[in-house]
């Protein structure tokens, strides 16, 4: 690839990455503060508002740290020291883990909420908010422990010349590790993500069954001439299933890009594509939640109307 093409590709990647970050930060900020207001303004706040607020907060942290990483990739002159590199990459990895945990537990909570009276999950209904909140805090602590090796694996490399280092930004790179350590950390990450993906798939299967039963009931009501309007539970279930499907597609695509990067030894283009793909869920999911929540759309419309009339 010649110099002009390389510059053109870098410009496209830069615009795409910063657009994704800025739009995602704005959307997640709106989502977080809206659900925070719902939590504080209701006499009996719904647990779903807490989980969506937690998800939007972790996604906000993820996108902010990604924005700082992107700034060091394209704008800065590689002036970070080792402490800055370690702190930022560690916080970014934690935010990614927290986001995965929050998305998974949101699926599990909704599965428990929609469980029938005959289901074994019914006994968890009343205590599920406490159990899931406790599980989220436990997972946060575990992520902090599992990601602690990053503090020793990342250094500042302003004048990177060795091929043994793995590029992260202009300032930061991963130290080369022995095969046993690499295998151990890779296995830990693979097991962790397989567990969460499996749990999300299980809960999604339950939600699909719920939608199927609801559709049969709607067809029966339609045949008898009664109203078959979609319930709030059905709309929320469809939203979560849509997000789950989108998450799985992005997860598969991210892994394809990652292995392509390793195979072709590409240090820039595939790496940028991988970053963009891996953070797309944090941006898109916030818009899905915003535009499927009637209360939020009404608030946004009223705000836009006031701005236009000023």
Swiss-Prot record:
Glycans are attached at residue 159. GO terms for molecular function: pheromone receptor activity. Disulfide bonds join 85-172. GO terms for biological process: response to pheromone. Pfam families: V1R. It is a multi-pass membrane protein. Belongs to the G-protein coupled receptor 1 family. Residues 42-59, 115-134, 215-238, 291-310 are cytoplasmic. InterPro entries: Vmron_rcpt_1 (IPR004072). Residues 1-20, 81-93, 156-193, 260-269 are extracellular. Keywords: Cell membrane, Disulfide bond, G-protein coupled receptor, Glycoprotein, Membrane, Pheromone response, Receptor, Transducer, Transmembrane, Transmembrane helix. Putative pheromone receptor implicated in the regulation of social as well as reproductive behavior. The chain crosses the membrane at residues 21-41, 60-80, 94-114, 135-155, 194-214, 239-259, 270-290. Expressed in 1-4% of neurons of the vomeronasal organ. Only one pheromone receptor gene may be expressed in a particular neuron. Not expressed in the main olfactory epithelium. The lineage of its organism: Eukaryota, Metazoa, Chordata, Craniata, Vertebrata. The gene is Vom1r93. It comes from Rattus norvegicus. GO terms for cellular component: plasma membrane. This is Vomeronasal type-1 receptor 93.
């Amino acid at each position: 690839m010649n110099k002009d093409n390389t510059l053109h590709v870098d410009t496209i990647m830069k615009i795409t990455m910063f657009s994704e970050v800025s739009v995602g930060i704005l959307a997640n900020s709106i989502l977080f503060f809206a659900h925070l207001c719902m939590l504080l303004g209701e006499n009996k706040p719904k647990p779903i508002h807490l989980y969506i607020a937690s998800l939007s907060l972790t996604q906000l942290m993820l996108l902010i740290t990604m924005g700082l990483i992107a700034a060091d990739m394209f704008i800065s002159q590689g002036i970070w020291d080792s402490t800055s590199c370690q702190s930022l990459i560690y916080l970014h990895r934690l935010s990614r883990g927290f986001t995965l945990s929050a998305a998974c537990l949101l699926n599990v909570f909704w599965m428990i909420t929609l469980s029938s009276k005959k289901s074994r999950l019914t006994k968890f209904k009343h205590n599920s908010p406490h159990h899931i909140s406790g599980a989220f805090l436990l997972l946060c602590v575990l992520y902090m422990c599992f990601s602690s090796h990053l503090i020793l694996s990342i250094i500042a490399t302003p004048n990177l010349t060795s091929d043994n280092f793995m590029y992260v930004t202009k300032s930061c790179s991963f130290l080369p590790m022995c095969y046993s350590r690499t295998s151990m950390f890779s296995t830990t990450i693979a097991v962790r993500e397989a567990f969460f993906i499996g749990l999300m798939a299980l809960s999604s299967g339950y939600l699909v069954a719920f939608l199927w039963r609801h559709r049969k009931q709607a067809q029966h009501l339609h045949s008898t001439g009664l109203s078959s309007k979609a319930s709030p539970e059905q709309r929320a279930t469809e939203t979560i299933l849509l997000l789950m499907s989108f998450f799985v597609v992005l997860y598969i695509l991210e892994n394809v890009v990652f292995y392509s990067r390793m195979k072709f030894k590409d240090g820039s283009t595939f790496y940028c594509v991988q970053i963009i793909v891996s953070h797309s869920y944090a941006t898109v999911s916030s818009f899905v939640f915003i535009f499927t929540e009637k209360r939020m759309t009404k608030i946004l419309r009223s705000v836009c109307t006031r701005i236009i009339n000023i």
